[in-house]
Amino acid sequence: MTTVFRKTGAAGVCLAALCLSLLVTGCDSLQEKPATPAATIPTTTPAASTPPASPPPIQAYDKAVLSAATALFKNARLPAEGMPAQAKYPVVIDPLIDGMTGAQSVATQAMGVRLANMMREQYPQFDVKAFSAANVAKSPLVLIGTFTGVNAERKTAGPRSAYRICLALADLRSGKLLSKGLAFALPDGVDPTPLAFFRDAPAWSEDPATEGYIKTCQGTKAGDPINPLYLDRILAASVVAEGIEAYEAGRYREALDFYTSALAMPSGDQFRVHNGIYLANWKLGRRQPAEAAFAKVVDYGLKHQRLAVKFLFRPGSTAFMANPALSAPYPGWLKAIAKQTGESSKCLEITGHTSPTGPEPLNERLSLLRAEAIKSRLAQNSSGLEKRMIANGVGSRQTMVGNGRDDASDALDRRVEFKVIGC
């Protein structure tokens, strides 16, 4: 699963994000086969190819969740080998996430609770366990799911008018998927507000653990292998999940212990871990450890070619919000970004983005002005960096969330991306 610069709505808050990204593409070659001799051409007419199956209809949210869950549980090909008669299958739920950003929200959290209750009440073959390192180490079944905004063509581009619910049940022992569930839901009744950890997180970057989770759930079928990016990191992910749960409850000291423990694991170098260490230290008033943790956040983003850092702007302005509770860490963030970027000797194209509300010419202008403002602030913190940056604005043409709410749920639509370019 980009931080963002952007215009805000009635709430009077705008968010900016900084991103570094690098795209590599390739293509396959085609080879023409020799023509079939006329005498060997078959005289029978080939059978018509089977048309692709139509996607499921868009349903009311509650009905869509029930439809996807029922398909998942009823069609599960449960392993029989090594299981005693009448035995229950232990299942853990790795918290469901947004399929574009990787964030957990009020909606995904509620869906996870509903799935757990369904298994307990209607499917006695399952024994729901907590998603903890101790339980994951026993190689149970694991349930994952993504909840992704889509447009009228069922694609993740432009204004989103529905949600795609994708569920998967996997067996950690065999390393394969046992079942899938898919449904499309109307947005009515959906609360996409991010949980506190994801709302407070200062930055976003692509994370292999999250990428593996999404790839395991999306574009797969029963019998397919679990994506290795996810399988290799699930033990550390369970510790991260416990840290997020502690953070949500305001137990910041406990959360810090979980994040620190996760970082020490072989697969613990995850972006959520670095964000968590920063957040917990900041909440505990530990300013120096928080600054050091944010430097690690920046290092991770630069290493993975993409970093998004959140800044809240005044509506229609390039000035930060005047609320000290929100903007107090910004000078330190800017200093760290400038220092790490300056030392990397890379050249950047800084591109501003906005939400789709308002006239697009105004959105494009505002996105450019905010990109230029961040460019100027970074240059003030690192001599020589000015000549290695250019600014650009694209308005709302490249939204990631696209729900047009202009609140915390679509914060990543209001971003400034930093793309590595040739010097």
What are these regions (language model features)?
Residues 102-115, 288, 321-327, 353-423:
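Periplasmic OmpA-like peptidoglycan-binding domain that tethers envelope proteins to the cell wall
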Residues 64-84, 318-351, 376-380, 418-423:
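Periplasmic peptidoglycan-binding/anchoring modules of Gram-negative envelope and division proteins
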Residues 86-102, 307-317, 334-371, 389-402:
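Short, surface-exposed beta-strand segments enriched in small/polar/acidic residues
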Residues 48-63, 302-336, 355-361:
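Short, solvent-exposed beta-strand/turn patches at coil↔beta or beta↔helix junctions
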Residues 232-300:
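Alpha-helical protein-protein interaction scaffolds
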Residues 27-86, 172-261:
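C-terminal/domain-edge helix-coil "capping" segments
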Residues 72, 76, 90-96, 121, ...:
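A short, hydrophobic beta-strand-centered structural micro-motif
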Residues 61-80, 84-125, 164, 199-200:
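An acidic helix/loop motif centered on a single conserved Asp/Glu
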